[in-house]
Amino acid sequence: MGNSVMEKIKGGLVVSCQALEDEPLHSAFIMSKMALAAVQGGAVGIRANTAKDIRAIQSEIDVPIIGIYKKDYDDSDVFITPTLKEVREICETGVEIVAMDATTRKRPHNEDLKDILSAIRKEFPNTLFMADTASIEDVYYADSLGFDLIGTTLYGYTEETANKNISDDDFSHLKEVLKSTKRPVIAEGKIDSPSKARQVLTLGCYAVVVGGAVTRPQEITTRFTNEIQKIQEERGK
């Protein structure tokens, strides 16, 4: 399955269809329709959160899905498919790719990422596993563990990388990631325009994931209202 899945997403756009519990569009049904709309628009894959959403999306579309499970634990900052329990639950949906936090941070219950990956590969040998990284150190770590794909997902979202953007310094972090691994790199995180998506693919990324810029209306609306607010502020001067 691995090679055919990789061919399907190569050079294309994966749309992240997620809405957390505190967001207006939080609904497996709504996410399934969001995914359908994304595929109709040309998306070659979908990234989705929770088994419930994934199964609803699977009923609507037939493209590869990157599955995750966002879950908070009191004893760790790691929340993207953080423990073996969540990894297994997402694998059981039959998604082609499962992504998990691959940072070097302490995991919930002191679970070890190496042990998680080793155990789950024995249970689901045909599933591909994607490492969500934040730093170059994470990339080397994930590479050494044998992840199938490397994502830049958490760059800008950890204490170490807070407020950083994938496009900073002419995509310097992404360029370093591409130099640091021979595994397929999936660009993800704060890619909020078509031009950024095109740029990361031009630099050599295998595929690109875009989320809020496509599927979070509140964020899209805010970008417009912020610009309009500037006009009002200028007139008030």
From Swiss-Prot:
Keyword Isomerase: yes
GO MF terms, alphabetically ordered: N-acylglucosamine-6-phosphate 2-epimerase activity
GO CC annotation, single: cytosol
Cysteine disulfide links: none
Gene Ontology BP annotations: carbohydrate metabolic process; N-acetylmannosamine catabolic process; N-acetylneuraminate catabolic process
Reaction(s) catalysed by this chain's protein: an N-acyl-D-glucosamine 6-phosphate = an N-acyl-D-mannosamine 6-phosphate
Keyword tags: Carbohydrate metabolism, Isomerase
Functional pathway: Amino-sugar metabolism; N-acetylneuraminate degradation; D-fructose 6-phosphate from N-acetylneuraminate: step 3/5
Organism domain of life: Bacteria
Keyword Isomerase: yes
CDD domains: NanE
EC number of the protein: 5.1.3.9
InterPro entries reported in the protein's UniProt record: Aldolase_TIM, NanE, RibuloseP-bd_barrel
Function in brief: Converts N-acetylmannosamine-6-phosphate (ManNAc-6-P) to N-acetylglucosamine-6-phosphate (GlcNAc-6-P).
NCBIfam families referenced in this protein's UniProt entry, alphabetically: PRK01130.1
Alphabetized PANTHER family for the sequence: N-ACETYLMANNOSAMINE-6-PHOSPHATE 2-EPIMERASE-RELATED (PTHR36204:SF1)
Family the UniProt entry places it in: Belongs to the NanE family.
Listed name of the protein: Putative N-acetylmannosamine-6-phosphate 2-epimerase
Species this chain originates from: Listeria monocytogenes serovar 1/2a (strain ATCC BAA-679 / EGD-e)
Gene name of this polypeptide: nanE
